[in-house]
């Protein structure tokens, strides 16, 4: 006689049932999407990513913002030999990125606060990404009449390797880096989400006047991020008074899963915002 299914089998059965069932208002349960706390960004995770931003199928992530077939035909550009000509276009670009979004607390909280912006959670862990996607699907069903959460989505991505594949120059108005892996050991610092190289990539995808939001409970990592952004000529740290007046800062402090954990443990939260400056005229 077969014994009861193990935890792994239960998780697989639960996710399969959600995939095969009708649209559900019920939020997914985290216990069925467990995964390690961190993933190695230098490993080959067999990720799917576009060759360029023009080849990204955004319409499947934001169907409510996709142009009609007639509108797409009217604005169709000459074919360049890529698959981009067959993709349905969006009425507007994604402009807010929650990098390392975890279980999607911030992504979901920002959606109703920024109703005119398309918000994208980006997460490297497969099962965690699946959880956020199911969470957003359920919220869309719950808010079908109001239309909330149509502006939020999540993809599995390694932004340390492929961020320019998703976003064109000056596309983003906000990037959130919330409670990233501190990588305490010196030999692991190269895996931190902020570095000299990555600061240059952030400068490329963030438009002038845009903001990068950072928060961590590790003071050493906070100082590291401040040092690297201050060293980049196109970023300037936002003054504390302006920082505290930004409603996104309070959301960032309170709505992420890691932020809630730090609050429960009475831990510190170190916040720093950096504004993208105008490019020099030359």
Swiss-Prot record:
How does this chain assemble?
Answer: Forms a complex with trm82.
Which Pfam family, giving just one, matches this sequence?
A: Methyltransf_4
Q: Which GO terms describe its molecular function?
A: tRNA (guanine(46)-N7)-methyltransferase activity; tRNA binding
Q: Which domain of life is it from?
A: Eukaryota
Q: Where is the composition biased (Basic and acidic residues)?
A: 10-29
InterPro entries from the xrefs?
Answer: SAM-dependent_MTases_sf, Trm8_euk, tRNA_(Gua-N-7)_MeTrfase_Trmb
Q: Where, per UniProt, does this protein localize?
A: Nucleus
This chain belongs to the protein called tRNA (guanine-N(7)-)-methyltransferase
Q: Any idea of its EC number?
A: 2.1.1.33
Family, per the entry?
Belongs to the class I-like SAM-binding methyltransferase superfamily. TrmB family.
**Active site located where?**
181
Principal localisation: nucleus
Identify the Gene3D superfamilies for this entry. Vaccinia Virus protein VP39
GO CC entries: nucleus; tRNA methyltransferase complex
Give the pathway listed in the UniProt entry for this protein: tRNA modification; N(7)-methylguanine-tRNA biosynthesis
The protein's matches in SUPFAM superfamilies, at most eight in alphabetical order, are given as: S-adenosyl-L-methionine-dependent methyltransferases (SSF53335)
């Amino acid at each position: 006689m077969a014994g009861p299914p193990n935890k792994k089998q239960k998780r697989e059965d639960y996710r399969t049932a959600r995939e095969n069932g009708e649209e559900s208002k019920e939020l997914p349960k985290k216990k069925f999407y467990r995964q390690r706390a961190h993933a190695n960004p230098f490993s080959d995770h067999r990720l799917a990513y576009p060759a360029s931003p023009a080849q990204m199928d955004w319409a499947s992530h934001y169907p409510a913002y996709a142009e009609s077939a007639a509108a797409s035909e009217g604005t169709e550009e000459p074919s360049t030999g890529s698959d981009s000509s067959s993709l349905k276009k969006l009425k507007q670009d994604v402009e807010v990125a929650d990098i390392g979004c975890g279980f999607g607390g911030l992504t979901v909280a920002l959606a109703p606060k920024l109703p005119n912006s398309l918000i994208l959670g980006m997460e490297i862990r497969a099962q965690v990404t699946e959880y956020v996607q199911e969470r957003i699907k359920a919220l869309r069903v719950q808010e079908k009449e109001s239309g909330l959460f149509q502006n939020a989505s999540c993809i599995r991505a390694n932004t340390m390797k492929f961020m320019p594949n998703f976003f064109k120059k000056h596309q983003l108005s906000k990037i959130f880096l919330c409670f990233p892996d501190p990588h305490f050991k010196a030999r692991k610092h190269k895996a931190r989400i902020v570095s000299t190289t990555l600061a240059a990539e952030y400068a490329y995808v963030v438009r002038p006047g845009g903001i990068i939001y950072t928060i961590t409970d590790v003071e050493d990592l906070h100082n590291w991020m401040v040092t690297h952004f201050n060293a980049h000529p196109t970023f300037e740290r936002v003054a504390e008074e302006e920082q505290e007046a930004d409603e996104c800062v309070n959301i960032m402090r309170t709505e992420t899963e890691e932020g809630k954990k730090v609050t429960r443990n009475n831990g510190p939260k170190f916040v720093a915002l950096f504004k993208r400056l105008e490019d020099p005229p030359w």
